[in-house]
Regions:
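Intrinsic disorder/low-complexity detector
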Residues: 1-140
């Protein structure tokens, strides 16, 4: 069974899947069809119980990850200082101890952070795991 949630967004702070991370092969056909019909700034999230995968689609790109490989999910942000900062949604992986950025805004934006924080309950319920909020400080 596939569960899906389409979340509103804003063209003023577009989130994107990082370059080179999109893997449309892992997207269930029905999700790909529905995501293609949404406006480019809306974010589609899904969980596929059959493949035990979660995923994100936005602006004709998608990324999916097997839930069994995920240690934790988090909203990360770094406020502007000398650098631009960022707002991201990340998965911390079990095997590599690394993180995979599922989607991000490449510069800090308070509205983008508020939107993502406001949708963490929906994403946590859909993905079946808690989502931490991580303040990474200032971008020096």
């Amino acid at each position: 069974m596939i569960q899906m949630e389409v979340l509103g967004g804003s063209v003023s702070w577009p989130f994107a899947i990082p370059p080179g991370r999109s893997n449309p092969d892992g997207v269930p056909p029905r999700v790909a069809e529905l995501s293609a019909k949404t406006t480019s700034w809306r974010l589609s999230a899904w969980r596929d119980a059959a493949s035990n995968a979660i995923g994100i689609a936005i602006n004709e790109q998608a990324i999916s990850i097997d839930v069994g490989h995920i240690k934790a999910l988090s909203v990360c942000f770094m406020r502007r200082a000398k650098g631009p900062g960022f707002v991201s949604f990340e998965a911390r992986m079990l095997e590599t101890r690394g993180t995979v950025v599922l989607f991000a805004a490449d510069h800090f934006n308070e509205d983008a952070l508020r939107w993502l924080e406001g949708n963490t309950d929906k994403l946590a319920a859909l993905f079946g795991m808690p989502i931490a909020i991580e303040d990474c400080g200032l971008d020096y």
